[in-house]
């Protein structure tokens, strides 16, 4: 029997193509520095195909031969600092001066694994099973999550705009996960649609924490490579500026903006108090005013003007759902305001007419005693 290195199902080895997913046995990786499917790490994990990759790592589907379960395994691979030939599994430093920086990166990567592992009892945060050093790099073994990232999930909607009610519910679930993370003394630092998994029944899982990225931020590479424009608040662009849980709340506000507007919000550095971004309520006419206000508060340039914590963010979303009129949209607010103004104008006009007529009557009609004197 043969195990498919894409879906990890077992099938008869006489077939070259997996009958479950159609994967062709022996297919090489799309990018030459990715591990070849079938590679074994630590005499335990059989590496499969690539799930995703970025500037700091590659994530593969894998099979844990000891536990007999499908997993995801993330390899630390900072593009620009290392390379790997097709003949070896070991990573090679690109320049002797990068060794200290690279080792610091590995330390941060493994520290991230330990950080995530403390939340293994939580259902809305990815679970870590193992972490190890091998091939002159490091690996994190995590649960394999059936589902898709929010980034991918949004593509099913026209203009990638999610129904408001659904977006609010997902934002509440992310806020709940962030409340747990922050209570554990951790800041995620990388909340974005690509790090939020949508699972069955629209439950969510928070993925990659941003700790492993920090080592590069402290070194020489450009911040534009590290940060995700639109989701990173101003304080993340300044290396000495304090970051706290409000950093994640800005990002969550940006995620909510992305879900309801269909576009990534403007980069923080492009915004000023004098020329701020267009309010989401103007960009989407059926957006309730309270959602507009929540997004703008969460994405305030000054951290002091944002929600103080994730629970406060969630509470605001709950208040909006339960206490605001569902028809309270920006277009209807404008129409309502116009109607109120017109009513006030008419009332003032009627009052003016009443007093005008009364004054004229008093002026033109002589009192009875004056008529008698004149008679």
PLM feature spans:
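C-terminal lobe helix-coil module of Hanks-type protein kinase domains
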Residues: 230-322
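Activation-segment/catalytic-loop signature of the eukaryotic protein kinase fold
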Residues: 130-131
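AlphaC helix of the eukaryotic protein kinase fold
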Residues: 83-119
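AlphaC helix of the protein kinase catalytic domain
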Residues: 150-162
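Protein kinase catalytic-loop region centered on the HRD/HxD motif
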Residues: 174-186
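Conserved short submotifs of the Hanks-type protein kinase catalytic core
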Residues: 135-149, 153
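Activation segment signature within eukaryotic-like protein kinase domains
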Residues: 170-171
